[in-house]
């Protein structure tokens, strides 16, 4: 993959090496349940959506959406095609969700429909997908309009195959108001015979109108597509629309030709060039190097000119110029070196090594046109020398003082089933990767919006902790800042086999994860205790404690959505919206 290799710089001041553990707290968590008028518009996977990518993209979809500019407001889409808004004004007097928008077309008529999705591009703009392939851009006006349900369609257009909205932004560029949106789909790939038979498409759509035309029509400026073989964990557009950042198991690439999504990139074209027939073959023994190649059609021995120099070789063909010229890997004996014509158009050049026993790594330095053919006897000799370092048995000496790793002792977080995960930044102008970070042993955990005006944050596991990173596109030398740490959370979440959603509070006061059904786990940051505690085992005083709390829903319906504010957790099931009071209002 192109792009400069970078690394993430951990802020050591945000780490707590003395953190011990979370203490289970039995303090009650007030939970308020709101019954829904209509069930959530859940779309289950079809029989032809059988891959892991389908499950990640659509089977584990979060049906509950938050407005970062109104943190105590959440939204969902029900089976009556309505976008429903729920806002907490008073914990003891919960209202009912209200309709703010209704899709104008019948969604059930589409056989390959996906779940409807939405994202707040700004405080006044929302992007919506109905799950059938149509994109909506909605103006919601001021806060009172968003609560009263007066949302206005400013753009709607069918873009092709069904998709979900991943991320969107609103910006002003060159006197244009631009809405950028990322759309994700998993498409059938007939050319992928050995793989799953699908590829992942991430489309970057830019729609715009003149800034001074409040009621002007929006038109699509650009449509750019990224192709890959895995659903990205994280994908977001930079605030000014200059690039895209993503985290994925497998690499993505832009395609310039929308009509031919399988057109190879420049890198792939170079790879294809490298796969062509070699210009020549060469092999070696301890005393000499042999080079063989074919003369072009119509050429004879008289058309060939070969010059030997102690450290160079020059082969040219009449009317065709230089065939091979350059510095040899090591010096040769010119008097003993020779060449002969073989049967047909074959030419064999023998170079006598000046230093017998020296193994050449290449024939002509930096020349990639030839192919090395290993001598079977030499290969066997090397294998015999290395025999003592290899074994056909998994553990040939189980009584050894240092036995090999026991796979049964590995945790989930220690096993990497797929290719190495990368964090990449793609330039929006040249459509190439400019920065690449190999995450290696830092698995992705979750995504969260801490500051609405900035890109979403993402959390990665570092050792046992979960570190929260804020992308900052204005700092090319330090694109990702470490802004918060959740102690031991990386270790804790690895033990939760049934976890479904993961999030945290915007002020980082707590993190939370939920299982597929009922249970929610809350992990609070360390806070001072009212009375000082004494650790008798270590003989020291403890001034602060990190608490863990567990909440359990009354319903056994599967959890479909999960969002957090500084004070509350919102949990969505098929027919109920539960509000858990986590913190008191500051």
Swiss-Prot record:
Cellular component annotations (GO), alphabetically ordered: cytoplasm; nucleus
Q: Where mainly found?
A: cytoplasm
Q: Does the keyword Ion transport apply?
A: no
Top-level taxon of origin: Eukaryota
Cellular localization per UniProt? Cytoplasm; Nucleus
On whether GTP-binding is a keyword of this UniProt record, the answer is no
Cite the entry's keywords alphabetically.
Cytoplasm, Nucleus
Return any one Pfam family short name: CS
Domain spans labelled CS: 275-364
Q: What is this protein called?
A: NudC domain-containing protein 1
What is the species of this protein? Xenopus laevis (African clawed frog)
Q: Which gene encodes it?
A: nudcd1
